[in-house]
Swiss-Prot record:
<comment type="function">
    <text>Hydrolyzes the pyrophosphate bond of UDP-2,3-diacylglucosamine to yield 2,3-diacylglucosamine 1-phosphate (lipid X) and UMP by catalyzing the attack of water at the alpha-P atom. Involved in the biosynthesis of lipid A, a phosphorylated glycolipid that anchors the lipopolysaccharide to the outer membrane of the cell.</text>
</comment>
<keyword id="KW-0997">Cell inner membrane</keyword>
<feature type="binding site">
    <location>
        <position position="9"/>
    </location>
    <ligand>
        <name>Mn(2+) 1</name>
    </ligand>
</feature>
<feature type="binding site">
    <location>
        <position position="40"/>
    </location>
    <ligand>
        <name>Mn(2+) 2</name>
    </ligand>
</feature>
<feature type="binding site">
    <location>
        <position position="78"/>
    </location>
    <ligand>
        <name>Mn(2+) 2</name>
    </ligand>
</feature>
<keyword id="KW-0443">Lipid metabolism</keyword>
<feature type="binding site">
    <location>
        <position position="159"/>
    </location>
    <ligand>
        <name>substrate</name>
    </ligand>
</feature>
<keyword id="KW-0441">Lipid A biosynthesis</keyword>
<feature type="binding site">
    <location>
        <position position="121"/>
    </location>
    <ligand>
        <name>substrate</name>
    </ligand>
</feature>
<protein>
    <recommendedName>
        <fullName>UDP-2,3-diacylglucosamine hydrolase</fullName>
        <ecNumber>3.6.1.54</ecNumber>
    </recommendedName>
</protein>
<feature type="binding site">
    <location>
        <position position="194"/>
    </location>
    <ligand>
        <name>substrate</name>
    </ligand>
</feature>
<keyword id="KW-1003">Cell membrane</keyword>
<feature type="binding site">
    <location>
        <begin position="78"/>
        <end position="79"/>
    </location>
    <ligand>
        <name>substrate</name>
    </ligand>
</feature>
<dbReference type="InterPro" id="IPR029052">
    <property type="entry name" value="Metallo-depent_PP-like"/>
</dbReference>
<keyword id="KW-0444">Lipid biosynthesis</keyword>
<dbReference type="GO" id="GO:0009245">
    <property type="term" value="P:lipid A biosynthetic process"/>
</dbReference>
<feature type="binding site">
    <location>
        <position position="163"/>
    </location>
    <ligand>
        <name>substrate</name>
    </ligand>
</feature>
């Protein structure tokens, strides 16, 4: 069994999401061969040298899962693209490049965060290219912590404001980009997150059937894609209210 999740946006202000994730680690993930986290794992990440006590607790929880035998793979999202080798080493996980092709159930599957598919949002794509440049990353990682915190808040607020103003089709994936990149990597299954629009889309690429599986964000409920001998199953689950969790 292999599990894939994305867009948890973990932060101390959302203990319900944190509890649901920790429950997943202590339960179903212990029985899994691998856990893939496809970006926006944290709501914000300003550097491995600036881990808060909350983020450190998540790191330790991942390490416990890794030590139990489950392999963990982590991909950058647009909120946590500064996650580095230091965190991954401490958490016992492997950093995946975006995009990556992996074998799931004997089938090559393309994994992405999904933001690079939104090519109609030209302003965002330009900003993404700038922020992911090695020189920009080097500069960001060497800024004072206070400056990084302020910059992260500014970028997050601007991102939220711009997303609210943009048309839905602009912030969703570009339809023509999906078959193009699937053909480029020679796959018939694509799994990604980012858009917060969970679904399984059936496609036709040439004369072959294909599918695009969109993982859901963890806001009002959690989403998990489970891959096993039964196939690919995308499902959601409700969070346990924090008041109940505290009593157990």
């Amino acid at each position: 069994m292999i599990l894939l999740i994305s867009d948890l946006h973990l932060e101390q202000e959302r203990p319900d999401i944190t509890r649901a994730f920790l429950d997943l680690l202590a339960g179903r993930a212990r029985e899994a061969e691998s856990l893939y986290i496809l970006g926006d794992f944290f709501e914000v990440w300003i550097g491995d040298d600036a881990m808060s006590p909350f983020q450190l607790s998540i790191c330790k929880a991942l390490r416990e899962l890794s030590d139990s035998g489950t392999r963990i793979f982590l991909m950058h999202g647009n909120r946590d693209f500064m996650l580095g080798k230091g965190f991954c080493k401490a958490a016992g996980c492997t950093l995946l490049s975006d995009p990556s092709v992996v074998q799931l159930n004997g089938e090559p599957v393309l994994l992405m965060h999904g933001d690079s598919l939104c090519t109609r949002d030209e302003g965002y794509i330009r900003m993404r290219r700038y922020l992911r440049h090695p020189l920009t990353l080097f500069i960001l990682r060497h800024l004072p912590l206070g400056t990084r915190h302020k910059l992260a808040r500014k970028l997050r607020n601007e991102s939220r404001a711009q997303t609210r103003m943009k048309a839905n089709d602009i912030v969703d994936v570009t339809p023509d980009e999906v078959p193009r990149i699937m053909q480029q990597f020679g796959v018939r299954t694509l799994v990604h997150g980012h858009t917060h629009r969970p679904a399984i889309h059936k496609l036709q690429i040439g004369d072959q059937a294909a599918r695009r599986i969109v993982l859901g964000d963890w806001d009002r409920q959690g989403w998990v894609l489970q891959v096993d001998e039964q196939g690919f199953n995308l499902s959601s689950f409700d969070f346990v209210p924090e008041t109940v969790a505290l009593l157990n």
